Amino acid sequence: MANSIHISRRALRKNVFLTLLMIVVLSVSEVRAQYDVVFSHYFDMETSFNPGAAGKDPKLNINAAYAMDMAGFEHNPQTAYISADMPFRFLNATHGCGLEFTNDKLGLFNHTRLSILYANQQRLFGGTLGIGLQLSLLAEKFDGSELDLDVGSDPAFTTSQVNGQAIDFSAGLYYSRKAFYVGLSAKHLTSPKVELGELNELQVSASYYATAGYTFKLRNPMLQVKTSALAYTDGVMTRADITGRLIYTSEKRKMYGGISYSPTNSVTALLGMDIRGIHVGYAYECYTNGISPGNGSHELFVGYKMDLNIVKKGKNLHKSVRFL
């Protein structure tokens, strides 16, 4: 799971350095941040970066994830996420809607985002194109009271708790056809500025995403290979992830193992299975830039999918329960 505030998370290796970073950041009048979280399970959490994916399947889709970066370091980044989306019929057309909540703790910063998503799902070239919009409320907090350095009475340093809010907009396109999908999206389109107290501002930079994936069927009908990729940039920091998973499916169980590679950043191992109808996934990200393998990132994912029978009269009948 990747995340950054002006300087990449990968650079925050020691508590002392983290504290110094926060003082430097808060000692200027404007902070520019690209702090979006990208999860290792991005292939199951597409609405987290592309609202066009809302309602793409005729199912109620509920996801939750918890990620802990740089295990073993004090004040290490930790993120909690939960979302739900589903399709619905209105005026003889298919739409998608969703809700999303994210809480991201990075040192003395706390980022909270509550979002509503909408997508218009249209048939195109034998597949489905989702055109999505997202409206978010950003709530930012910095707790300067926890600074452990003696900064005296210098007014340039924020040594109290400061809060701020802002409205944010995102948009995305998501196209899927049989075993293939591709998506483009942009978050923080208006580059919202959050006032933190009277002296400081948090500038949230726009970020851009591209994703694609394809499922390969093997001779053994119980096996298939799912490949996916995600790239994003804010104009300063760029990251790409390439993932492959081997899926085993039988009448009574489903499980997978896989690996993800991010050039110059990390290698991630992925494991997942269905447990009593709930899909559970685990990922461990090992950094390749000098951080000890034991100080990698842990991520836990839980997913639930329920089939919906959406008829033209607008009645949604729950026929059966199926899972990833």
Where is each model-derived feature located?
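Subset of outer-membrane beta-barrel
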Residues: 34-324
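Bacterial Sec-dependent N-terminal signal peptides
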Residues: 1-36, 244, 271, 306, ...
